[in-house]
Design a protein with these regions (language model features):
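NTP/phosphate- and nucleic-acid-binding module
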Residues: 2-234
Length: 234
């Protein structure tokens, strides 16, 4: 991203974008306390400031940078103007002031950010591996299981719930093996909620919702499921 502004407003906009970019990273990481700024001491001759957003808990030595935020001043447009012969000054229509816009540049890498998101979320516990992704970025928000796949009445109700939820959320379906293995399979891919339809569900119209991180189980009314998931994703 390149943000063009008045030279006198560079400080304001540099700090603005520095804050905005860090806030975005913190909004998607599981442990935002693992993020920080690195201020460059050696700068290009045209630069006044340069910061990197880093994953400070990285085990990769110096490979911590996810995004750079740079004060480029008027260097880019001045050089373009010099070599192209084009006047790239901006004229303020209200004041008539003429100036070369200054540039705040932010540049990030998707591959390294993805790597650090995985490192930040990965956990090995005594009896399971769990990817504790921020629910906002989990590939699936929920998974629906019939307690027993060979019971048509359970499968029918579970499939109905699955069809309803997938309208608004990325939802997985799994009826393989036993329920414990299904839970752990979803833990490994970071699914925040597992929803189990059991025999009680046929009577009380409620399902068991298991949270990925706490493994706590709650009974939630079927007609309240969508709102429950939405609330916990906010």
């Amino acid at each position: 991203l390149q943000w063009f502004c008045h030279p006198k407003e560079m400080e304001k906009w540099f700090e603005y974008w520095k804050g905005e970019r860090m806030a975005w990273y913190k909004s998607i990481f599981t442990h935002p306390e693992n993020l920080g700024f690195y201020q460059h001491e050696k700068l290009a001759h045209y630069a006044k400031k340069a910061f990197d957003i880093e994953y400070i808990a990285s085990p990769i030595g110096n490979g911590k940078e996810m995004e750079g935020i740079h004060w480029r001043g008027d260097w880019d447009l001045s050089r373009h103007s010099e070599y192209s012969g084009q006047d790239l000054d901006y004229v303020d229509l209200e004041t008539g002031e003429k100036f070369i816009p200054n540039i705040v540049e932010t540049s990030g890498g998707v591959d390294r950010t993805f790597l650090f998101l995985m490192l930040d979320a990965y956990n090995e516990e005594d009896d399971r591996v769990v990817l504790k992704l921020n629910p906002k970025i989990a590939p699936y928000k929920a998974a629906v299981f019939p307690l027993l796949a060979n019971k048509p009445e359970l499968a029918k109700l579970a499939r109905s719930i699955y069809d309803d939820l997938k309208i608004n959320f990325m939802t997985a379906w799994d009826d393989r093996g036993n329920i414990g293995k299904r839970y752990y399979a979803q833990d490994e891919i970071g699914t925040p909620f597992c929803i189990t339809v059991d025999f009680e569900s046929l009577e009380d119209k409620k399902v068991t919702v298991r949270g990925r991180d706490s493994m706590k189980q709650e009974r939630i009314a079927i007609d309240e499921l969508a709102e429950y998931i939405k609330k916990h994703l906010e």
